């Protein structure tokens, strides 16, 4: 199968760029498309790649076919990474939505990940406010606000005081 010489270099450059991007960390398909379409910094400033839409589609298909690009694997690793950093399910869902991951895929993976979000919320609260957790109303509100900002659900936050009474 012979390709035109003008599209071969653009395709090859795109493919090389995609592999380099995916070698650093997993990306969603939407993230990879955005990064591939962004101008490349050359010696004389930003340079556009003269690739066609077909070149982009072929590169994405090649990455899927060779398992460089896998949205399901990306979602699993992203959830694990963000939960280790102390973020809750609401914030993780929002970030995955921004990265172009479908709600169904996110929900399916969140169910499979088996993370105890109320325990994670408690760990974050203890890390920030110390043990024992505050019991007066105004201090509890501060803890709740902090955990809501981190993306935890109100049910998980309320579990802290229900299950872990002093």
UniProtKB/Swiss-Prot annotation:
Family from the record: Belongs to the RecX family.
Compartments reported by the entry: Cytoplasm
UniProt name for this protein: Regulatory protein RecX
UniProt keywords, alphabetically: Cytoplasm
One Gene Ontology biological process: regulation of DNA repair
Entries under PANTHER family matching the protein: REGULATORY PROTEIN RECX FAMILY PROTEIN (PTHR33602:SF1)
Chain's role: Modulates RecA activity.
GO cellular component, one term: cytoplasm
Pfam families cross-referenced by the UniProt entry: RecX_HTH1, RecX_HTH2, RecX_HTH3
């Amino acid at each position: 199968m012979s390709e035109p010489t003008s599209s071969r270099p653009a395709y090859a450059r795109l493919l090389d760029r995609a592999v380099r991007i995916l070698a650093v960390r997993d990306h969603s398909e939407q993230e990879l498309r955005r990064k591939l379409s962004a101008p490349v910094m050359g010696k004389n400033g930003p340079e556009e790649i003269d690739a066609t839409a077909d070149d982009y589609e072929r590169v994405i298909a090649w990455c899927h076919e060779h398992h460089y690009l896998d949205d399901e694997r990306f979602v699993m690793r992203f959830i694990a990474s963000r939960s280790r950093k102390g973020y809750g399910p609401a914030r993780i869902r929002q970030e995955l939505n921004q990265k172009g991951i479908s709600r169904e895929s996110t929900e399916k993976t969140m169910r499979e990940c088996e993370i105890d979000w109320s325990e994670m919320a408690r760990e974050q609260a203890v890390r920030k406010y110390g043990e024992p957790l505050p019991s007066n109303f105004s201090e509890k509100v501060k803890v709740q606000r902090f955990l809501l900002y981190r993306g935890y659900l109100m049910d998980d936050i309320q579990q802290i005081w229900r299950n872990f009474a002093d």
